[in-house]
Amino acid sequence: MRMVRRFESDHGRKTLGEVRVLRPRRQLSLKSGPYGEKTMRTTSTAALSCIFGVLVAACGTGDQGGVGLEAEARPAALAFSAQSDVVHVYNWVDYIEPALLEKFTAETGIKVVYDTYESNEVLETKLMAGKTGYDVVVPSTGFLDRQIAAGALQKLDRSRLPNWSNLDREILQHLNRHDPGNQYAVNYMWGTAGIGYNEAQVKAVMPDAPVDSWRLIFDPAIASKFKDCGIALIDAPSDISFIALSYLGKDPNSESPEDLALAEKALLAIRPYIRMIDAARYIDALATGEICVAIGWNGGVLQARDRAAEAGQGHVIKYSIPKEGTLLFFDSLAIPKDAPHPDNAHAFINFLQRPEVAAANSNFVKYANGNAASFALVNDAVRTDPAIYPPAELKSRLVPDTVESPEFSRMLNRTWTRFVSGS
């Protein structure tokens, strides 16, 4: 069942509209900085190092205060579709500072109807079917190429995006490999997948647990030890198969049926020890001690860390980038081909690229953003957090995902179904 939250505020006679929540994904994050890229299916460590070394920077704290918003559960509706003063946004859950939606409405009079999804696969299914009713979507680069090729997205009008000048040039170069000429998308946030763990619970079970390795989860002999305190995986087929192949020493972007079969074998071997496969619930479960180990996105694990600290129950949550390597992802803002309100979509995207807005967003969501001009405004704690900006020794471990062929996606979905069901 999906949960509905409605954020409203009065600014004259304007209201924000609805924020419909399915389930979170990569939760919250902060800044903008190092990135890497991989063409074809090999990664150049030197190229990654060059890209990661580009952002150095400035100081300043940008403590952005949030606006208190009341939440109310009620049935969702797309009642605003025919109106001109509305923008329909489809984004990952907990992937925006809610106060910014209110601010956008206050400044423009445009209501925000905000729906959420839990995986790229869900978004792509809707985009490929067409007539989504959405004006702004947030695909990852691994899916962007084929959405452009299929005609699911429309070109951006740069004349309506004056804040384009604030964008990080290195990230634009990365996106250019997926979107030649940067015609269809603008980076929103970027981050990594890794291991989130409850420090005390893990130590109690296994004092010498390999928290810096995917062995912690993929070695059945080790995973079995943590069955009782709980292991969670994000419900993200592409990301988990990428990670499984990294653990096995294979090309994580391989589309070989043989490699996928090896990944499936590794996953099925640990399936009896997995308590939760969910792109959202693992965050609170990690924060409250319901689980002790998770494969999650860095922002989600950091959000669990913050929630645990706020609760004051003694749970200390850590994030690790495994030594075998992991996924580096980039999420971008784009406009569906048949968006009902493209002018409002451009206004919303341009708003998000204002430096102070991008900084406030990163401070809340705990992910790095693609706005170079915002860097000095991001909180120091975010800018210096190695879970957000990995240090030099970790940068070579990050591998960007590439585009999946439709054939591989079908194979992967069948594999994932078997894994989730345990068959």
Role assignments for model-derived ranges:
Residues 91, 96, 122, 133, ...:
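Extracytoplasmic ligand-binding site segments that recognize negatively charged/polar headgroups
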Residues 260-269, 275, 313-337, 383:
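Periplasmic-binding protein-like
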Residues 60-63, 67-147:
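Early extracytoplasmic/lumenal segment of secretory-pathway proteins
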Residues 336-397:
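Mature extracytoplasmic/periplasmic domains
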Residues 143-146, 293-314:
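A ligand-binding cleft/hinge motif common to bilobed small-molecule-binding domains
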Residues 56-58:
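C-terminal motif of bacterial Sec signal peptides marking the signal peptidase cleavage site
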Residues 33, 196-201, 246-249, 329-341, ...:
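A bilobed periplasmic-binding-protein/Venus flytrap-type ligand-binding module shared by bacterial periplasmic
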Residues 284, 392-423:
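Conserved C-terminal helix/tail region of periplasmic/extracytoplasmic solute-binding proteins
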